[in-house]
Amino acid sequence: MRRQPLDRKETRMISQRCREAAWCWAAVWLLLFALAAARAAVPPKIPLKAEPFRLNQVRLLDGPFKHAMELDHKYLLSLDVDRLLHCFRVNAGLPSSAKPLGGWEEPKSEVRGHSLGHFLSACAMMYASTGDEALKAKVDRAVAGLAECQAKIGNGYLSAFPESFIDRVESLQPVWAPWYTIHKIYAGLVDVYVLCGNRQALEVVTKACDWVKARCDKLSDEQMEKMLGNEHGGMNEVLAEVHALTGEEKYLKLAQRFNHRAVLDPLAKREDRLTGLHANTQFPKILGAGRQYELTGREDLRAIATFFWDVVTKERSYVTGGNSDGEVFSPKERLSKHLGPTTTETCNTYNMLKITRRIFGWEPKAEYADYYERALYNHILASQNPETGMVLYYLPLKSGVPKVFGTPNDSFWCCTGTGMENHAKYGDSIYFHEGDKVLYVNLFIASELTWAERGLKLRQETRYPDEDRSRLRFACEKPVEMSLRLRHPYWAASGFEVAINGQTQAIASRPGSFISLDRAWRDGDTVDIRMTMTLRTEAFRDDPKKLAILHGPLVLCAGIEPGRPTAAIVSGEGEIVSHIRPVPEKPLTFIASPKVFRVTGPQAGRELTLIPLFRQYKKPYIVYWDVLGEAQWNATLAEIEAEAARQKALDAQTVDRVVIGDGPSEQAHALAGEKTGAGPHQERHWRHAVDGGWFSYQMKVLDGQPMKLLCRYWGSDSGPRVFDILIDGKKIATQRLNNNRPDQFYDEVYPIHAELTKGKSKITVRFQAHPGNMAGGVFDCRVLKSE
């Protein structure tokens, strides 16, 4: 039922009460706004066309975003500052009795310390979002602890690992990502200064930046460029930010030295060379280029950011707005083939939203806000467990894979850190303004905006997306003349209505644009917005027969029982969405007909319930569906049966098997090697050796009988992957992996002659990389009977 508008008298009464409660608080924050603005010593050369309101000008109201923020708030308060500081103090030679944290923060991790940087940023943002002084007290203590560590070391260096890590990255020796970690620490200090007014944070970060300058002054441009081949976060952004805060030109020049030309120069020429690159390594470089554009006016830097945004959002992203598979940019012409358990790293989307927010400020176009909404609901909100507040690393898009959430004190992945920030800053992109004459409403999130400079308070009341409407309510002492710009979402093609004080407006609007309402806004004015949500499908650009189901901006998924199902839409007559019906009295809940929406496994033949992906956190699920004809579906079922029979026969033929990547199995087979490692891909695990390295297993054989060695490979592996396979030191094969069978696993079988098994119950199988090459990855290794 459509909500009836309040009459003028009722509206004024509510507005007066809201105003009385708000203006005193607003005055306090207005003083803080002025102080924060004064902290910027260097005005941008490129003023923003649309400026975001500060977090402390926006308060969330009840809804899914406030709930997510409150869970994050609770988690931040639970974290022990002394435990976060432990490795910093140990590294500085200071005593620490705190229990070390686990995961990526354990004392031997090469990125230890990154989480404290994220913690500082998140607490500063949450303080601005809530005003909770307990958060400010925690960050003040953390900054004081960092200052003590920096003073003890004595040369400005500040990290939780020794400075020798920087020696290693400068000399191109193996090390994880020291500059990446340092960037997180510096960015946290900047946020604490800007959002909390902690002067000591600025003092610490400027001393640290002076240390960076002293290190980098010793490097030639060629040496810098080579060093930047190691992941280095957003050093080119945070140094530019310190320049803006201090006015010191040396920091801007230093920021420019951290511009990774191998990546940025092609983008400036509108060349997409992203395929195969580690995705999250690149996003901070783009953010840095964008910040430098604002401070210098260099158009090539703007071109880098806008072209990157276009390519990633329009050609390299999934329906959720996320991107990457296995943390890498997949070939965009085969994106539909890259649906695995490690799709869409959450850090990527965190950074893409930051890039989007920045570009929107330069050119306030609705397409930027449309993408922001897509990624915010379908990835960021979906990344948090709504019961525990824990966050995930990857948002998997492979059918039948569940979300995997971290733990409070033993994960601390990169996405744990960005997750702390994600849910602390939901208020930063709901509203924007152009000077004092234009107010943008980008997102339909229940919230209150206090624009004290205009004497205006705007309250957005909504149950969106459970309802397709939102109400804006004005409170002001005197009329405020301005243009109110409302986003008409790209997906609202079936209806977009606006009413002012209950009167429907005749507006010329199109999906994916802003409408302007220009008038003198008075106390008690209301604006009602209604956007018709409909079901629709979105397919891959490279495969129109693989698609997802959406309702309005929301990606829908089908929760299923554990297993590895095959999911398909066996299309009959009519539109696909005509086979989906809403469930009465259950918002955003739908039933998909089992005649059309089919799965294998326990739920075969049963109705499937579709809900928003952000609400599915307990079960494995299906997002993408193959569209097949009846004959194709039957052929698929036959293939599944044939593969099961093949696997059964293979197991019967197997004498011994190493489960690759499984610790007990590899240990039982006496794993040995040099320069070897293991990792996951497509729900399997690989092992490889790099740079001429090797690995070996001891495997059972039948004495004196000919045998076979079966190895499974990923058919898209390529590059320098040439290696020998040896049995007890005797070469039986040389294998080259060079995109042998794209986008699929395949088996190679090598004969083991009887003389190699004579008098033996075990053999040693060794994978030896050629010089400068890799051996593997090997995903399965079996010894088979010859017959």
Give the ranges of each region predicted by the language model:
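Short, Lys/Arg-enriched N-terminal segments with co-localized hydrophobic residues
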Residues: 3-12
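Bacterial N-terminal signal peptides that target proteins for export
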Residues: 11-27
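Bacterial N-terminal signal peptides
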Residues: 24-36
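Bacterial Sec-dependent signal peptides at the C-terminal "C-region" and cleavage site
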Residues: 34-44
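Aromatic (Trp/Tyr) and acidic
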Residues: 42-133, 137, 168-195, 232-250, ...
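Hydrophobic, small-residue-rich alpha-helical packing segments that form membrane-like cores
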Residues: 204-286, 291-295
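C-terminal beta-rich recognition modules with glycine/proline-rich loops and embedded aromatic residues
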Residues: 305, 370-378, 383-475, 510, ...
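Beta-strand-rich ligand-recognition modules
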Residues: 503-524, 530-544, 678-708, 712-786
